Amino acid sequence: MDLFKQLEYRGMVKDVSDLELAKQLLNEQKIKFYVGYDPTGESLTVGHLVQIVRMLYLQKHGHTPVVLIGGGTGLIGDPRETSERSLLTLEKSLENAQKIENQIKGLIKGNVEFVNNYEWLSKIDLISFLRDYGKHFSVSYMLHKDTVQKRLESGISYTEFSYMILQSIDWLNLYQNRDVKIQFGGSDQWGNLTSGLELIRRVLGKNDAVGLSSPLLLKADGTKFGKSESGALWLDKELTSPYELYQYFLNSSDTDIEQFLKLLTLIEQDEIEAILETHREKPELRHAQKVLAKAVVELVHGKEELETALQVTEALFSGEFNGLTKSAYKTLESVIDVVRFNGESLIELVVKSKLASSNREAREFISNGAISIQGEKITDSMYNVGETSKAFDTYAIIRRGKKKYALIVF
């Protein structure tokens, strides 16, 4: 199966500006292609993984990704369907841009190029912008773009209205100076992709470039992919732990699992089909979900963080915390109830840990042998908690029975 058909199999193709040219470039040549990221936040989210995995997949087949970080366009803001974006300061835009570049460098290694459009957009004066670029865009053409249409009633500023011109300048710049032949983006970027192709044609009188969009990833129930109850799922482990990421994908529905395996992993087609077949035989074992969760966490955070996520998952499932690594204990701090030890008595600590509702109840639990710390059953209510055995001189698990526990941090 050729590369373009592989992209179609994976659900990575929605709109293509020139189908035959796209097939020729991807199947018969080794080309440069680009994907752009505006630094609207300090981290990318799991929603960005679709484009990242596609870059990795094309790189694997000999093409060169060019990652454009929008330090310039981030100052303007891509029009949203609902309301105007808050403007970033130059300092914040460039700071976010550097963080996102570093994040992507951790994901895409080897033959890859990075550019920041602030380098060229910041050098264009207003007169040059209007004469050299603005003259190639008719207002009626711009008004017909979906993102603009959806904002006409509620209002759109000239700042955001001009965003497509800036992104088109990016496309022209990369086509002229880096021989970039394809721009990839989500289907919500289709208007910007085609505007860039039109600018190349008008300025250079030719156009052998291609725009290619992918469907926006929605879950089977129609909700947006990449959101949890606590909000966005970030690729920065300080914002979303590898354990949380693992749990998100482990809990994927059976109806979502096939598209997630195709869009968010580099697992090849034959193996994906085998995984799905095994899963269909015994869906209650959640085989496909486990493969997916492992693949995504390892891709984003590496093997070591995956092992930590697996350790914590197993500990919480089994109720056994022996042998955890320091990293696993650190993860537990954000997952289960945590109590900071400040010299409390055992009775006070049991109440503080929410394992008892009162001192009297705590005393009963202790005398009945229901309380243990770090696996040691405690029956003496006068026990000195400070002398307990600690993992890494910092952590201990206090528990009542098998399923009620908390993490003590000394």
From Swiss-Prot:
Renumbered ranges of motif 'KMSKS' region: 224-228
GO MF annotation, one: tyrosine-tRNA ligase activity
Protein's name according to its UniProt entry: Tyrosine--tRNA ligase
Signal peptide: none
Top-level class of the enzyme under EC nomenclature: ligase
Domain S4 RNA-binding, chain residue ranges per copy: 344-410
InterPro entries: aa-tRNA-synth_I_CS, aa-tRNA-synth_Ic, Rossmann-like_a/b/a_fold, S4_RNA-bd_sf, SYY-like_C, Tyr-tRNA-ligase, Tyr-tRNA-ligase_bac-type, Tyr-tRNA-ligase_bac_1
